[in-house]
């Protein structure tokens, strides 16, 4: 069956790189949402917790439950807040009005992305609702919209963020609250700005990538995951024979072809014409592709960024397309 290889050596290298930039592994929260960017959330969580990471960020409550044994501090970005051991991101005032007493919350502040988050002029109202419902403010954060782009917008938005922090500090004094944890930097922002907050939320860099322009001199990270497929069968295809759905590929000469057990249900795009190990013959099927030759296994990609550029997308999309049903094998 198709499977994913994961390099522990690459993971250690990436973690050392981001830890050095952040000022220590204690200032890193590993972003493990969406099945750890396709790497397999439980296995990846186990590895990275053993390497010293204490904080994790996930998308849902279900993801948090899967890794609860590995991290003492877990932030959930997109789920209904509960009064339990997890911390929950709050994006609007409506959610604050229905919190259970004791719920641990991180207020997300909209500093310019305008996707979600509490508006700057709503911050004090948010504090009033926190007090009213006796929720626990444990964090305040934002998200940068252009950290990996060749522009100065990151600096403008970071100025907004500094203003937010000052306002929050004034409000915690007013309401006699403990100082929350501040966090804003993602992978790209960490390498451009460093980390002056309590921690940075690091996702894509742990997996071996940034989308930073070369002018920013991005760090030398190593891809953790590679996607592989195994041979199902080989056959001789005669000159003039056509193969696959629609018969869109026609052999120009006699050739040996092989079927491999990865298709568009396994992380390959249906429109894809080639993989790292060669050209795809005909159309991609749901569960298989055809290549010339008879290798026992083939590499779909070992560098998601390089492959993504050929496909007109970004490394993130290729990685999260690796489905959960694929087995994941750690090497090194």
Swiss-Prot record:
Substrate binds at residues 115, 286. The active site is at 33 (proton acceptor), 245 (proton acceptor). Its EC number is 5.1.1.1. The modification N6-(pyridoxal phosphate)lysine is found at residue 33. One of its GO terms (molecular function) is pyridoxal phosphate binding. It catalyses: L-alanine = D-alanine. Pathway: Amino-acid biosynthesis; D-alanine biosynthesis; D-alanine from L-alanine: step 1/1. Its cofactor is pyridoxal 5'-phosphate. Keywords: Isomerase, Pyridoxal phosphate. InterPro entries: Ala_racemase, Ala_racemase/Decarboxylase_C, Ala_racemase_C, Ala_racemase_N, Ala_racemase_pyridoxalP-BS, PLP-binding_barrel. Pfam families: Ala_racemase_C, Ala_racemase_N. It is an enzyme of class 5 (isomerase). GO terms for cellular component: cytosol. One of its GO terms (biological process) is D-alanine biosynthetic process. Belongs to the alanine racemase family. HAMAP family: Ala_racemase (MF_01201). Catalyzes the interconversion of L-alanine and D-alanine. May also act on other amino acids. This is Alanine racemase. The lineage of its organism: Bacteria, Pseudomonadati, Campylobacterota, Epsilonproteobacteria, Nautiliales.
């Amino acid at each position: 069956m198709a499977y994913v290889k994961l390099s522990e050596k690459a993971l250690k290298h990436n973690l050392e790189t981001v830890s050095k930039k952040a000022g220590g592994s204690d200032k890193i929260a590993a972003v493990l949402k969406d099945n750890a960017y396709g790497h397999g959330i439980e296995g990846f969580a186990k590895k990275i917790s053993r390497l010293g990471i204490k904080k994790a960020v996930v998308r849902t409550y279900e993801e948090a439950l899967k890794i609860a044994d590995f991290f003492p501090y877990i932030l959930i970005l997109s789920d209904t807040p509960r009064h339990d051991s997890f911390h929950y991101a709050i994006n609007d005032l409506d959610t604050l009005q229905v919190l259970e007493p004791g719920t641990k919350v991180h207020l997300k502040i909209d500093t310019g992305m305008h996707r979600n988050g509490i508006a700057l002029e709503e911050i004090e109202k948010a504090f009033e609702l926190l007090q009213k419902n006796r929720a626990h403010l444990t964090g305040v954060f934002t998200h940068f919209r252009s950290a990996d782009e060749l522009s100065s917008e990151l600096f403008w938005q970071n100025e907004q963020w500094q203003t937010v922090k000052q306002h929050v500090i004034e409000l915690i004094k007013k309401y006699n609250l403990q100082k929350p944890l501040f966090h804003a930097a993602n992978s790209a922002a960490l390498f451009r700005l460093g980390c002056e907050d309590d921690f940075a939320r690091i996702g894509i860099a742990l997996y071996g990538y940034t989308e930073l322009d070369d002018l920013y001199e991005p760090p030398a990270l190593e891809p953790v995951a590679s996607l592989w497929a195994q041979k199902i069968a080989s056959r001789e295809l005669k000159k003039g024979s056509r193969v696959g759905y629609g018969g869109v590929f026609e052999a120009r000469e006699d050739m040996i072809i092989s079927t491999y057990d990865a298709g568009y249900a396994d992380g390959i795009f249906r429109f894809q014409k080639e993989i790292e190990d060669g050209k795809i013959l005909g159309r991609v099927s749901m569960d298989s592709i055809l290549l010339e030759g008879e290798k026992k296994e083939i590499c779909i990609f070992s560098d998601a960024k390089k492959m993504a550029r050929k496909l007109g997308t970004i490394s993130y999309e290729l990685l999260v397309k690796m489905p959960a049903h694929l087995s994941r094998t750690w090497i090194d």
